[in-house]
A protein has these predicted regions:
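N-terminal signal peptide c-region/cleavage motif recognized by signal peptidases
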Residues: 20-21
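GH16 jelly-roll
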Residues: 27-282
Length: 282
């Protein structure tokens, strides 16, 4: 019996050592399976349930407007919301919520919402966020990368989810890797590598992780640790120049041409719940 116990323990130990176990850093952050063993290190850990828990900490790490117009731009194109700081970044037990609120009527300019633009910038790496998106027609949560030099394009949309009742719903996410020819007339013609992924689940039902591995010549998208996109891609401006470092953005837009107008059934306040945003680099 004693011999059998030793054999059993040795066999169990061998099985454990042979099993794929995620590496956990000293701060308790697991290395994502997609990049485990590839030499990545954690460079930013914006954990809204642990190390960023109030407005002061948030402001040290993030701006709350776009970089354009001297850092004061509060919307893009025909979006209805205006990004503000009036109860639009709300901390609770689970993390941070970017909150869209109707403050002046359900119309363009009548909605305030929240956004984050990182003060940190970097080029290449593995960018991951764990979020729960809101349900409702006309809502447009997004997690993306944009150059710090204020020249657009390119951009990398890690996740965009809309429910416009037509081509894209909450059980898909849209991705964009943008750069293209000169003298184009609109945004869509410049975004030369885009598409959607539909796993058959409603992202508004719970938290999900969205990530991109961005290298000098490729982008790989991951949803809940599953790779869904793998494409050749070069980060450059329309004139062929390298676009340099990017900042990280997370925002909850409302309305506009793609998501359409909110419907009477769209519930406000609407919340994009953010557990964490992390960046890994080599």
């Amino acid at each position: 019996m004693m011999t059998m116990n030793r054999v059993s323990r040795r066999l169990l130990l061998a099985l454990v050592l042979a099993s794929p176990v995620p590496v956990v850093l000293a701060n308790g952050v697991p290395v994502p399976k997609a990049i485990d063993g590839q030499g990545y290190r954690l460079v930013k850990d914006w954990d809204f349930g642990k190390n960023i828990r109030d407005e002061a900490a948030l402001r040290r790490e993030f701006h709350t407007r776009y970089i354009y117009e001297n850092g004061k731009l509060d919307r893009l194109k025909d979006e209805w919301q205006r990004y503000r700081d009036n109860e639009n970044h709300v901390f609770d037990d689970g993390g941070l919520s970017l909150v869209a609120r109707v403050t002046g009527g359900l119309k363009p300019g009548g909605i305030e919402s929240g956004m984050l633009r990182s003060r940190w910038t970097g080029q290449y790496g593995y960018f991951e966020a764990r979020v729960k998106v809101p349900a409702g027609r006309g809502l447009w949560p997004a997690f993306w990368l944009n150059p710090e030099d204020q020249v657009w394009p390119p951009e990398i949309d890690i996740m965009e989810i809309v429910d416009n009742g037509r081509d894209t719903t909450r059980n898909s996410f849209h991705y964009v890797h943008g750069h293209g020819p000169k003298k184009t007339r609109n945004m869509e013609s410049k975004l030369d590598k885009s598409g959607s992924y539909r796993p058959g689940v409603d992202y508004a039902d719970g938290f999900h992780t969205f990530a991109v591995e961005w290298t000098e010549d490729r982008v790989r998208h991951f949803v809940d640790d599953v790779m869904v996109v793998d494409r050749a891609y070069v980060w450059q401006h329309n004139d062929g120049r390298d676009a340099g470092p990017a900042h990280v953005l997370m925002n909850l837009a409302v309305g506009g041409g793609w998501p359409g107008a909110p419907s009477a059934a769209t519930a406000f306040p609407a919340r994009l719940q953010v557990d964490y945003i992390r960046v890994w680099q080599k």
